[in-house]
Each structure stands twice: as structure tokens, then as C-alpha cells.
Amino acid sequence: MPTYTPKAGDVTRTWYVIDATDVVLGRLAVQAANLLRGKHKPTFAPHVDGGDFVIIINAEKIALSGNKLTNKFAYRHSGFPGGLSKRSIGEQLEKFPTRTVEKAIVGMLPKNKLGRQIERKLKVYAGAEHPHAAQQPIPFEIKQVAQ
């Protein structure tokens, strides 16, 4: 009997919604990346996009452990000499709450064409509302929340 190899057309995708309220950023990112890649499915193959869609709500209420709000920085470069700018994660969470969560999750995905394709299935929203009610997303519970 030949070994089963999953194909892109054989995949059934589910929609999950994750509430990020008081969840540590790294723990949320690991769970979301596993759902996006499809590592929770028995048909997982690293070369096939077999993952599910993930909606993250309340990204503005994410928790960070330790003093990361003030001591960890997000760097950007304009491309010009001396164009490096930095902003603390606390400042970035206030101004762009979805960007911090997206960057943490995308950093755990493959850095190739497949990773960019998987990244499109991630939807992050700062508040509690999202426009994907028609997809009937299943709530995904993350048990470890910040104390």
C-alpha cells in the first residue's frame, strides 16, 4: 500500500476564533501558528498548505510577561542612511495593536512562498468585533493566561 500524500485540494479548512484577552503573546503565537500550518491534523505535510483559518480578536488586550512592554523594541528601517527607528512594544501596542500580534505569529511560519500563502489565512482585529460571522468560526480556548 503506497504512502498517503495530502494534496492541496483534499484539505477541508475550518475557521477558528481566538480571544487574546490576557493571553501571553508567545503562547498565543505558537497555538495560532500550529493551527495555520495544520500541525494539529493527522494529514500534516510540511510542503502542503493544509491549515485552517485563524481569527484573533481583542489583540489590544494581549499580555506580555516581564518588562517587555518597556524593554523590548520593534525596529524599522526606511532604507536611507540613518533611517533606523525603534519603538517600544508598549508604544506599538497602543498605536498598532494588530501589528505586534501578526509579527509574532508570522515569525513562526516558514520564510518562503508557502509561508506567505499561510499568512493570508490569519486575520487579526484589535477589538471584539470581526466581519467573519458568516464562516461560523469555532472558538479556540487557550488555557494558559497571564496571572
Swiss-Prot record:
Naturally occurring in which organism (per UniProt): Mycobacteroides abscessus (strain ATCC 19977 / DSM 44196 / CCUG 20993 / CIP 104536 / JCM 13569 / NCTC 13031 / TMC 1543 / L948) (Mycobacterium abscessus)
Entry annotated with the keyword Ribonucleoprotein: yes
UniProtKB keywords: Ribonucleoprotein, Ribosomal protein
Disulfide partners: none
Gene: rplM
Entry similarity comment: Belongs to the universal ribosomal protein uL13 family.
UniProt lineage: Bacteria, Bacillati, Actinomycetota, Actinomycetes, Mycobacteriales
Reported function: This protein is one of the early assembly proteins of the 50S ribosomal subunit, although it is not seen to bind rRNA by itself. It is important during the early stages of 50S assembly.
Quaternary structure annotation from Swiss-Prot or TrEMBL: Part of the 50S ribosomal subunit.
HAMAP family (alphabetical): Ribosomal_uL13
InterPro entries according to UniProt: Ribosomal_uL13 (IPR005822), Ribosomal_uL13_bac-type (IPR005823), Ribosomal_uL13_CS (IPR023563), Ribosomal_uL13_sf (IPR036899)
GO CC term (a single one): cytosolic large ribosomal subunit
Protein name (record): Large ribosomal subunit protein uL13
Coiled coil: none
GO MF, one annotated term: mRNA binding
Keyword Transport set for record: no
Gene Ontology process terms (BP): negative regulation of translation; translation
Pfam family, one: Ribosomal_L13
